[in-house]
Curated annotation (Swiss-Prot):
CDD domains: FU, Peptidases_S8_Protein_convertases_Kexins_Furin-like. A motif (Trans Golgi network signal) lies at residues 776-782. The lineage of its organism: Eukaryota, Metazoa, Chordata, Craniata, Vertebrata. It comes from Bos taurus. This is Furin. Interacts with FLNA. Binds to PACS1 which mediates TGN localization and connection to clathrin adapters.
């Protein structure tokens, strides 16, 4: 018994020695397995294997099987002839081959970066799992290759040794100085280091012996210099819209003043740039805008008063300290989607990245630090699946973010069982989980938007105002939503001290979002003017049901104000196949499968749904329909949208004599109400000759009166207007000619060119005027020639 362990090690050592020798000589290493072709099925293969002392390891594919022989050496430099020849003589065996061990190397196998500062990048992968799980994404082979990221900031030091290898000029521009070079402006205080530091977090080169590594260290990185100068709406829009089909991700760590009293957001051009980015960027998949949530924590600011982070088009990121606490500068709001790491207290580590003047720093901090980390993780995710849309990415973030290790007192479970916080969103980004889920991700259904006006009259806010409204989330319309993504409460209100207000929104599934917390420094009496407070906390909930808006005065003062407008805007999806035709209401009788067979009065049945107006090409008609009940078949008279005759474009019935309008290739007979095809010659003759007068209907045929197209009252105003204009013109011309005849010989005439007959006479100018302007005949002729040439040009145009 004691010899068995020794025997195992001897065999293992012998096998290893065989491999080493074979590798050195370049020889084949034969294994104790065979691939065998045996028609007839697995039972025949099993029988042949047992007959010759083999074990059938299973089917490779088709009639090919994998045989193993325990008595044959596992590794050998020569083939096993005896067993091979026995199998070869078997009639059922059509082909066989002893298997050879092949050397195969994994490509892009993960190796830990060798950069000197990498061990200090605790947030990429740590032993306590308080990290972003970036090394797991690297181990899966994703490093950001093929993805382009642009940092919208104060420039990027493109010649930095840890950035130059990944620098992309196509993702860079200097909007401040209007040139392609984004190099920052150097000052004694290094004020413009922001963009260079952010760039290093995303794509610092790996294994080059400089500084640390970027999250997506094989991604391409660029920068837009747009903050080192006067920032206008045009500057922002141009930066946000730079090369949208080349740049995949835009990272921004800036916004309005974080002073606890500002309410500001993108203006017209920047808002349009956001919309164009998500609708047209990346070939229609949508640009991804990553935004830092804000630095106004000390001022009790709310990032819902920042229109950039509060936008549905941005992926808003917050931060946590090394030990999972809320940083002192962090802002809380319901628009935050997820969190990455940044700095905190003095005894906690900060972020390692590139710095100005080709240096490295270990003390990067603030919102500048955490948004670029998210941009890098998103670059890894896009490499795993380049077909992800901008909304797919937000779905992945919601589904994979981890609330563990993050400390806050406002963690809550929403209506679909996810934990969410105003400080952290759905938790820490998990790079490994995101790339794993992205690889087989199915694109979400197209976005739907449901807009509901809640208020019917202004309401006094007082100490506390509560507005309740039960909604169907646009049921029966194309915008019907069953799975929510973003929800907006667009509010217009006046209040004498805006900072005392706290606003909450409660979803039908009970999720309570803080749209606005009290801001002690906000003394403004401006209120809010159609401001869209956004929440992501009800993601994937069913928005149908009662929504509750709560507005509260948090101070003891007798403040006053009025809520004048409240519009609930829901963004989301509905399951594929859910019927959402226009005006799908008014059904009177439903089948067991919820298909409509009879509509209420004023509605017509169209494709198993009730509509108030039949679509073009259809007309309502009362027909007998057969309705199958459990034990019988009933005949029901119902209004149904029936198709027009093939010759009609629109109609009032299914017959060829029910046409109201015709296709472009046909003309309408106003008497017969039929459409007839026209040849090219007949169309030309109709254009040259006036149409014949309408033929009166035969007197002897008694038919039901029908509204004729040539008697429609809608043409009467046009006829009256035309006759009136003709009469006025006739009177004017008559009076003008009479006056000209009476005074025609007492004034001089000037001939100028016109388009029609070439000459027209302007009369009525006194001779003194000509003498004053034309001191000589030559000057008069010259002036007349110039005017004539001018009028010729104008007439030609």
């Amino acid at each position: 018994m004691e010899l068995r362990p020794w025997l195992f090690w001897v065999v293992a050592a012998a096998g290893a020695l065989v491999l080493l020798v074979a590798d050195a000589r370049g020889e084949k290493v034969f294994t104790n397995t065979w691939a065998v072709h045996i028609p007839g099925g697995p039972a025949v293969a099993d029988r042949v294997a047992r007959k010759h002392g083999f074990l059938n390891l299973g089917q490779i594919f088709g009639d090919y099987y994998h045989f193993w022989h325990r008595a044959v050496t596992k590794r050998s430099l020569s083939p096993h002839r005896l067993g091979h020849n026995r199998l070869q003589r078997e009639p059922q065996v059509k082909w066989l081959e002893q298997q050879v061990a092949k050397r195969r190397a994994k490509r892009d196998i993960y190796q830990e970066p060798t950069d000197p500062k990498f061990p200090q990048q605790w947030y990429l992968s740590g032993v306590t799992q308080r990290d972003l799980n970036v090394k797991e994404a690297w181990a899966q082979g994703y490093t950001g290759r093929g993805i382009v990221v642009s940092i919208l900031d104060d420039g990027i030091e493109k010649n930095h040794p840890d950035l130059a290898g990944n620098y992309d000029p196509g993702a860079s521009f200097d909007v401040n100085d209007q040139d392609p070079d984004p190099q920052p402006r150097y000052t004694q205080m290094n004020d413009n280091r922001h963009g260079t530091r952010c760039a290093g977090e995303v794509a610092a080169v790996a294994n080059n012996g400089v500084c640390g590594v970027g999250v997506a260290y094989n991604a391409r990185i660029g920068g837009v210099r747009m903050l080192d100068g006067e920032v206008t709406d045009a500057v922002e829009a141009r930066s946000l819209g730079l090369n949208p089909n080349h740049i995949h991700i835009y990272s921004a760590s800036w916004g309005p003043e974080d002073d606890g009293k500002t309410v500001d957001g993108p203006a017209h051009l920047a808002e349009e740039a956001f919309f164009r980015g998500v609708s047209q960027g990346r070939g229609g998949l949508g640009s991804i805008f990553v935004w830092a949530s804000g630095n106004g924590g000390r001022e009790h600011d709310s990032c819902n008063c920042d229109g950039y982070t509060n936008s549905i088009y941005t992926l808003s990121i917050s931060s946590a300290t090394q030990f999972g606490n809320v940083p002192w500068y962090s802002e809380a709001c319901s628009s935050t989607l997820a969190t990455t790491y940044s700095s905190g207290n003095q005894n906690e580590k900060q972020i390692v990245t590139t710095d100005l003047r080709q240096k490295c720093t270990e003390s990067h901090t603030g919102t500048s630090a955490f948004a670029p980390l998210a941009a890098g993780i998103i670059a890894l995710t896009l490499e795993a699946n380049k077909n992800l849309t901008w909304r797919d990415m937000q779905h992945l973030v919601v589904r994979t973010s981890k609330p563990a290790h993050l400390n806050a007192n406002d963690w809550a479970t929403n209506g679909v069982g996810r934990k969410v916080s105003h400080s952290y969103g759905y938790g820490l980004l998990d790079a490994g989980a995101m790339v794993a889920l992205a690889q087989n991700w199915t694109t979400v259904a197209p976005q739907r938007k449901c807009t509901i006006d809640i208020l019917t009259e202004p309401k006094d806010i007082g100490k506390r105002l509560e507005v309740r409204k039960t909604v169907t989330a646009c049921l029966g319309e194309p915008s019907h939503i069953t799975r929510l993504e973003h929800a907006q409460a667009r509010l217009t209100l006046s209040y004498n001290r805006r900072g005392d207000l706290a606003i909450h929104l409660v979803s039908p599934m009970g999720t309570r979002s803080t749209l606005l917390a009290a801001r002690p420094h906000d003394y403004s009496a401006d209120g809010f003017n159609d401001w869209a407070f956004m929440t992501t906390h009800s993601w994937d909930e069913d928005p149908s049901g009662e929504w509750v808006l709560e507005i509260e005065n948090t101070s003891e003062a007798n403040n006053y104000g009025t809520l004048t407008k409240f519009t609930l805007v829901l963004y989301g999806t509905a399951p594929e196949g859910l019927p959402t035709p226009p005006e799908s209401i008014g059904c009177k009788t439903l089948t067991s499968s919820q298909a409509c067979v009879v509509c209420e009065e004023g509605f017509s049945l169209h494709q198993k749904n009730c509509v108030q107006h039949c679509p073009p090409g259809f007309a309502p008609q009362v027909l007998d329909t057969h309705y199958s009940t459990e034990n019988d078949v009933e005949i029901i008279r119902a209004s149904v949208c029936t198709p027009c005759h093939a010759s009609c474009a629109t109609c009032q019935g299914p017959a060829p004599t029910d046409c109201l309008s015709c296709p472009s290739h046909a003309s309408l007979d106003p008497v017969e109400q039929t459409c007839s095809r026209q040849s090219q010659s007949s169309r030309e003759s109709h254009q040259q000759q006036p149409p014949p007068p309408p033929r009166p209907p035969p007197a002897e045929v008694a038919t039901e009166p029908r509204l004729r197209a040539d008697l429609l009252p809608s043409h009467l105003p046009e006829v009256v207007a035309g006759l009136s204009c003709a009469f006025i013109v006739l009177v004017f011309v008559t009076v003008f000619l009479v006056l000209q005849l009476r005074s025609g010989f007492s004034f001089r005439g000037v001939k100028v060119y016109t388009m029609d007959r070439g000459l027209i006479s302007y009369k009525g100018l006194p001779p003194e005027a000509w003498q004053e302007e034309c001191p000589s005949d030559s000057e008069e002729d010259e002036g007349r020639g110039e005017r004539t040439a001018f009028i010729k040009d104008q007439s030609a145009l």
